[in-house]
């Protein structure tokens, strides 16, 4: 072996493996889809630390790389805490034509995620504000909660907000979350409180601003009806802080309803998908047209709707005959929406997949999208 070759090999053995600067690693990881973060976190402690750091998500925002993910919460028998899952497209998978896809394995799946400090209490409403999901406990018939838990979707950790006096239902508008109270007197400061998600502070709505009236819903927050206590749907105008009764009916399951922009979508007990423009005073439901290729749901199916990057996501379950009807399969469909005129909205089924097998006794708690 020649002398130069010996020298080169000696230098290779003696030189330590150089590591990349941390800011460069952050810049690289910020360009990678978050769906790969779980696998990347086992590469090293450094990667694991960076993947949960605020700097990474700030960089993703600056690079225009935020992604929307659908979070699904399920309850299982004999488990105190709920399970959380994220809808993923399997790596290196592309959507295929429906006829061919039936012969292939699923392209999408609901993948479990570890959640730290998950509260054991159940909530009746969940609202997304950026990368946070705020959970409010119980319905109006139950005792009021005094604090609000929120899930940080970047670190998958539950945190506790500052305490408030009363909160039940909520909705997000311009970085603030509104919490109407229960049957308090109209002059009570506990009637409505506003939580500023940026400053994490509570402020009561002044009594003179709490008024009930009828009118159109332009630019207002919709609060779904509740079957159990016959509460009708209402809307809040955040600009002037006034309430309005809304004629949306009371026969809708909260999970079978969602808002996309100013349009309300629902799946009614008759098996129809409907929509309503909340900017009109009439408040009439219209049938969602199209939906070619979407399977018919069984009458027993649990059906949930959620907004997902401007599209409509539908989740439903179906018994698995091969299991002796001891299991159910959760299915998911993504539907793009096209408003053709003031009277018609058409839905196009982009894909549908079997995403998770569950025991028949499971409970579907909620589905909500967050941007991280």
Curated annotation (Swiss-Prot):
Keywords, sorted A to Z: Kelch repeat
Entry's Gene Ontology BP terms: ubiquitin-dependent protein catabolic process
Domain spans labelled F-box: 14-60
Per-repeat ranges for Kelch: 176-222
Alphabetized Pfam families for the sequence: F-box, Kelch_FKB95
Domain of life: Eukaryota
Protein name: F-box/kelch-repeat protein At5g48990
UniProt organism field: Arabidopsis thaliana (Mouse-ear cress)
């Amino acid at each position: 072996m020649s002398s130069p070759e010996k020298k080169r090999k000696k230098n290779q053995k003696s030189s330590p493996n150089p590591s990349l600067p941390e800011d460069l690693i952050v810049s690289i990881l910020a360009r990678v889809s978050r769906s790969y973060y779980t696998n990347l976190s086992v590469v090293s402690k450094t990667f694991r630390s960076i993947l949960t750091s605020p700097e990474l998500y700030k960089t993703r925002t600056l690079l225009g790389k935020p992604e929307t993910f659908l979070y699904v919460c399920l309850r299982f028998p004999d488990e105190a805490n709920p399970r959380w899952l994220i809808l993923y497209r399997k790596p290196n998978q592309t959507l295929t034509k429906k006829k061919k896809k039936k012969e292939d394995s699923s392209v999408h799946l609901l993948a479990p995620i570890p959640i730290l400090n998950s509260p054991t209490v159940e909530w009746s409403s969940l609202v997304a504000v950026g990368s946070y999901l705020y959970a409010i406990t119980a319905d109006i018939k139950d005792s009021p909660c005094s604090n609000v838990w929120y899930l940080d979707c970047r670190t998958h950790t539950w945190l506790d907000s500052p305490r408030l006096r009363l909160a039940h239902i909520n909705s997000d508008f311009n970085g603030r979350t509104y919490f109407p109270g229960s049957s308090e007197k109209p002059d009570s400061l506990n009637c409505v409180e506003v939580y500023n998600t940026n400053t994490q502070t509570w402020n009561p709505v002044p009594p003179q601003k709490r008024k009930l009236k009828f009118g159109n819903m332009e630019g207002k927050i919709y609060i779904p009806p509740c079957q159990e206590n016959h509460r009708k749907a209402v809307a809040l105008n955040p600009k002037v802080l006034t309430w309005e009764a809304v004629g949306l009916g009371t026969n809708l399951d909260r999970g079978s309803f969602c808002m996309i922009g100013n349009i309300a979508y629902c799946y009614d007990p008759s098996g129809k998908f409907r929509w309503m423009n909340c900017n009109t005073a009439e408040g009439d439901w219209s049938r969602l047209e199209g939906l070619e290729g979407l399977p018919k749901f069984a009458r027993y199916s649990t059906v949930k709707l959620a907004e997902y990057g401007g599209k409509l996501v539908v989740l439903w379950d179906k018994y698995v005959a091969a299991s002796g009807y001891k299991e159910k399969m959760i299915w998911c469909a993504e539907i793009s929406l096209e408003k053709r005129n003031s009277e018609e909205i058409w839905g196009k089924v982009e894909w549908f997949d079997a995403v998770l097998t569950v025991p028949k006794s499971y409970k579907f708690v909620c589905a909500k999208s967050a941007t991280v």
